[in-house]
From Swiss-Prot:
HAMAP family: CcmE. Heme binds at residues 130, 134. InterPro entries: CcmE, CcmE-like_sf, NA-bd_OB-fold. Residues 131-148 have a biased composition (Basic and acidic residues). Residues 131-164 are annotated as: Disordered. Residues 1-8 are cytoplasmic. The chain crosses the membrane at residues 9-29. Residues 155-164 have a biased composition (Polar residues). It comes from Serratia proteamaculans (strain 568). Residues 30-164 are periplasmic. This is Cytochrome c-type biogenesis protein CcmE.
Length: 164
């Protein structure tokens, strides 16, 4: 192999290694900023054909309806706990902070946070839904069934969606 070809080969190898390293670092950085959207039933029963459930400690967004009678506020702190339900399940959500003005029982919400032990979502942010007109299509599709399931069908959030 002549020296000119050899130097081009080395340059091509260095460029490929650089591109691979850059792509790996970008994917690693983006991975920590991705929050997947789940409904309560998808957290309890799994999502997709493989029924993949989120892991404890995973960042996620959960969307559903606030179960009537489930909102509990701590009088001494700003901590609030409530249940979010859909047609096939209910999940506990805890949040510390001031809730949006549109937050109320029976209203649609999206909570962003981390999944804790016992399928409890520790939310960092709670968004109250006011109109489905402004909802992304994949979220709107997942939320369509939420209006169908009666909140009284869920005794506890850990009942895996079983009806009483």
């Amino acid at each position: 192999m002549n020296p000119r070809r050899k130097s081009r080969l080395y340059l091509a190898i260095v460029v490929l290694i650089g591109v691979a390293l850059t792509a790996t670092l970008m994917l690693y950085a983006l991975r920590s900023n991705i929050d997947l959207f789940y409904t309560p039933s998808e957290i309890l029963q799994g999502k997709g054909e493989n029924h993949e459930k989120p892991e404890v400690g995973q960042r996620l967004r959960i969307g559903g309806m606030v179960m009537p009678g489930s909102v509990k506020r701590d009088q001494k702190t700003l901590q609030v706990s409530f249940k979010v339900y859909d047609a096939r399940g209910a999940i506990d959500v805890t949040y510390t902070g001031i809730l949006p003005d549109l937050f109320r029982e029976g209203q649609g919400v999206v909570a962003q946070g981390v999944l804790g032990e016992g399928n409890v979502v520790n939310a960092r942010e709670v968004l109250a839904k006011h109109d489905e007109k402004y909802t992304p299509p994949e979220v709107a599709d997942a939320m369509k069934e939420n209006h169908k399931g009666p909140a009284s069908a869920y005794a506890t959030p850990q009942n895996e969606g079983a009806k009483s």
